[in-house]
Regions:
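Conserved N-terminal phosphate-binding loop of PLP-dependent enzymes in the Aspartate aminotransferase
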Residues: 1-180
Length: 180
């Protein structure tokens, strides 16, 4: 799988039982990674790292995956959910940029962004593909801020869009890919 995906040397694969479990593992990885970011360690008074998800995104019904799922009707019954997961308008580069810009150590600043999770073709609210410019901007912002880019390919991976993974059509390489 690593070779087929064109992943860098040293990449790893985690096998689970479902898409939700794959997304759960990706979010756990992001939480662990976030603790290593400057200013994010709670042990030394840092602010918890954040995970950015998209409006209209669906990542599963387990607690972590549900926390990154946007639809209030699905989420509300199970609150409180995993903290420090925020939503930005899917496709809005300025909103994504603003989410990264909110990082700061001041009284109103937030912790650093550990990861951005997105589906390249959202299916919960219809078939809504994200634009290539948006996806490339997300990759660039993640690189600039040392955040992980998580691509949820549960509904789009393994050849469902004409390539092995949908991200291959966008000319980017994510840090984490989940699929079932």
């Amino acid at each position: 799988l690593v070779k087929l995906a064109g992943a860098p040397e040293g990449s790893r694969v985690y096998f689970g039982n479902s898409g939700a479990e794959g997304n759960e593992a990706a979010l756990k990885l992001a939480k662990l990674y976030g603790r290593t970011l400057p200013g994010a360690s709670p042990e030394i008074g840092g602010k918890p790292a954040r995970i950015i998800s998209m409006t209209h995104g669906f990542h599963g019904r387990t607690m972590g995956a549900l926390s990154a799922t946007w639809k209030p009707a699905i989420r509300e019954k199970f609150e409180p959910l995993v903290p420090n997961i925020e939503f930005v308008e899917a496709g809005n580069v300025e909103a994504l940029h603003d989410a990264f810009a909110e990082t700061g150590q001041g009284k109103y600043g937030k912790g650093p962004v550990a990861a951005v999770i997105m589906e390249l073709i959202q299916g919960e609210a219809g078939v809504m593909p994200l634009g290539a410019d948006y996806v490339k901007a997300a990759r660039k912002l993640c690189d600039e801020h040392k955040a992980l880019l998580i691509i949820d390919e549960v509904q789009t991976g393994i050849g469902r869009t004409g390539t092995l993974f949908a991200y291959q059509q966008y000319g980017i390489l994510p840090d984490v890919v989940s699929f079932a």
